[in-house]
């Protein structure tokens, strides 16, 4: 992997990158490019950054020994960096992966005169803002794909959990990290489905997939192979079913996301956040509410089912099997996908026909499914992309 970012498509590999991006966009693909804010002496921009003083100085006010880190407290650094990214965005790039950022030096002097002791935690916030601002200026929205964050970074979504181990421990830690960042005020979050560090075992990949698709933003990323066809046709078909689960639920995801942004709620929320008066909800760390109506319990270990705590006083209906469960602890067998998904009694969940990409979804073809046990009517939320207005729908 070439870590030397030059903010340009290699001429020997991309004859016409602008046309390539246009062609991809016409097929429903939005391109996201990776980069980082660190520059070694091998990088073509290293001399310029040093000459113009756009880097974080060491504790003696001098050039660091190994590499330079962009200093986002310096307005000239921000201008230089946004110009590089802006050229790519104007070319047709959809988003920028804002990798790293947690490695801001503590023993350092920043352009604003403050030390690393003060600026270390603020570094990812400034980093997130710098990228989000240029994307919003050119695209009208400030979507990024960031790894590091600090208080305030929730204004610049979205963030993902970093390099998870391809183990069951890594899977469990990923679930907990998603719940933790939600409690920290972040609406949206993603993770590397299957883990990152080494090739993911197929059994783990299978269980991680439905969880990954039942988060606000889904992506597969890590040590190769991650493409499903490398695991065989049967796995590819299974991967497609997991993806289609989310695509069918896109009206639910979209409406719940809108409600989250209006109220500051996380899409992935701990049970205690939704049910603070239920003592049992405070003890559960491996389940979550996906929006206000769906409870998700990932299969963190191999098996056909798991124990699930159902909060509140209402009943719950299994999304896959239709079985009804009382609140409290239940052992629940999985349906066709290795994950437990339950719908709160009295919920109406909107669905949409599967499409090749979200651009092609037919929002005039939404259907509603009622989930009723003891309740007499069902309610749900709807938000259409064309008007962005959140509506509460009641179905007798």
Regions found by a protein language model. Give the residues of each.
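Catalytic core of carbohydrate-active enzymes
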Residues: 132-134, 141-142, 149-160, 173-177, ...
């Amino acid at each position: 992997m070439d870590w030397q970012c030059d903010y340009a498509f290699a001429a020997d590999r991309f004859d016409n990158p602008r046309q390539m991006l246009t062609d991809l966009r016409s097929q429903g693909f939005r391109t996201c490019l990776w980069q980082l804010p660190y520059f070694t002496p091998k990088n073509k921009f290293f001399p310029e950054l040093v000459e113009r003083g756009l880097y974080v100085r060491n504790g003696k006010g001098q050039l660091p020994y190994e590499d330079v880190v962009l200093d986002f407290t310096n307005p000239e650094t921000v201008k230089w960096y946004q110009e590089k990214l802006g050229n790519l965005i104007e070319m047709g790039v959809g988003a920028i992966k804002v990798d790293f950022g947690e490695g801001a030096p503590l023993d350092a002097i920043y352009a604003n005169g403050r030390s690393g002791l003060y600026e270390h935690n603020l570094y990812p916030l400034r980093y997130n803002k710098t990228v989000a601002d240029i994307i919003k200026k050119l695209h009208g929205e400030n979507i990024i794909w960031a790894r590091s964050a600090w208080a305030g970074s929730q204004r610049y979504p979205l963030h993902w959990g970093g390099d998870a181990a391809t183990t069951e421990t890594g899977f469990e830690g990923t679930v907990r990290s998603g719940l933790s960042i939600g409690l920290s005020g972040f609406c949206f979050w993603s993770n590397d489905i299957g883990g990152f560090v080494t090739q993911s075992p197929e059994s783990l990949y299978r269980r991680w997939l439905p969880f990954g698709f039942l988060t606000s933003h889904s992506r597969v990323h890590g040590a190769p192979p991650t493409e499903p066809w490398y695991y065989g046709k049967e796995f590819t078909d299974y991967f497609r079913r997991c993806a289609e689960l989310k695509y069918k639920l896109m009206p639910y995801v979209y409406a719940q996301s809108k409600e989250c942004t209006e109220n500051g709620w996380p899409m992935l929320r701990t049970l205690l956040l939704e049910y603070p008066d239920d003592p049992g909800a405070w003890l559960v760390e491996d389940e979550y509410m996906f929006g206000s109506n769906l409870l998700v319990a990932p299969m963190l270990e191999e098996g056909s089912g798991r124990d699930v705590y159902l909060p509140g006083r209402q009943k719950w209906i299994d999304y896959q099997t239709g079985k009804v469960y009382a609140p409290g602890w239940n052992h629940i067998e999985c349906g066709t996908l290795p994950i437990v998904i339950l719908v709160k009694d009295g919920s109406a969940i909107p669905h949409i026909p599967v499409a090749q990409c979200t651009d092609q979804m037919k929002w005039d073809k939404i259907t509603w499914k009622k989930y009723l046990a003891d309740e007499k009517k069902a309610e749900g939320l709807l938000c259409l992309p064309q008007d962005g207005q959140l509506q509460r729908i009641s179905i007798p």
